[in-house]
Amino acid sequence: ESGNGVPDALDEVAWELKWLLKMQSPSGAVAHKLSVTDWSGTSPPSTDPGARYFAPDTASATISCCGAFAHAAIVSSAQGDPASQTFGAQLQQAALDAWAWLDANPGLIPSYYNNQGFSSVACEDLPYDQDMNRLRAAAYLFELTSDVVYRDWVDQSHTRAHLFQWSWVSPWEDVAQSGLLRYAIHPGATASVSGAILTAYRDEVSGVDHLGHFQAVDDPYRAYLSDGDHSWGSNRTKALQGEAFMRMDTLGLDPGQAPLYRAAARGYLHYIHGVNPVGLCFLTHMDAHGAERSMRETYHLWFADGTIWDRVGVTFGPPPGYLVGGVNPNYAPDGSYN
């Protein structure tokens, strides 16, 4: 739509990535966050005059950005225009710099950022999640550079994933699972490790904890999650569970039951689109795109009461196509509510 020859989704991602690049210091480390110290804010964000402060550099932020930069470098470098390819090279160097900082500072891994001076959420990752984020970063860096250093990292660390420790596939483990699968399908991956990853994933998703719930019709809306998984951001959890079934099909891990996996995945898509207890399409403002009852407003500071993005029918409402958080029986307002 922007007319620059690049998909708009990639333009949006590039805008975010350029901000993340500003968070990286010359050392390769990345600041944990940049935020106001309280819950203040305004809409649109470009009019917000509040002072913002950097948190310190942390291993968790550096690890996460390392993987994001490497993944984005692969995508950007594959575009046909010179600007995207140049940006891809910049992202690759940023990923390499982040990895080099991590290698040079093993004593700072994992990080335990305490959010000192801020009221907003700290968003520190658990040590296990930092480990899995780095595994995924290694998988993308191996694909990007073909350097066996990153292959060896995955080979030596993959069994620490819950996929192997607990024989567990979960929508809460997508960081680890997506990294492992990305590595497993790479032609340069160590064959024994690749085979172990694909077998472990297949055996779990084809079993009672995943396909079994679909076959038993344990959810009348065909989008099963356990009660405890209906929490903050449950629509994301639903979508990732559906993706687990799609991976079984797209990777050909159990071809004899491929129609079942596709049907199971569709259940989660239909749930998002309106086949759910409240009969709502959980995407915002989709009236012009075929939805009869899409979300007319959403709880977000940028689309707050009194703004032109407040509610469809009263004002313009939120932009089309945003996925709202979803059902959450444990919801309680935090400091940003007021």
List the model feature ranges, each with a label.
Residues 24-34, 107-111, 146-149:
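Proline-centered turn/helix-capping motifs that create local helix->coil transitions or kinks
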Residues 7-29:
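Carboxylate/His-rich catalytic cores and anion/metal-binding grooves
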Residues 25, 31-35, 78, 114, ...:
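Short, solvent-exposed loop/turn and secondary-structure capping segments
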Residues 74-80, 85-91:
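N-terminal module-boundary/linker segments of secreted carbohydrate-active enzymes
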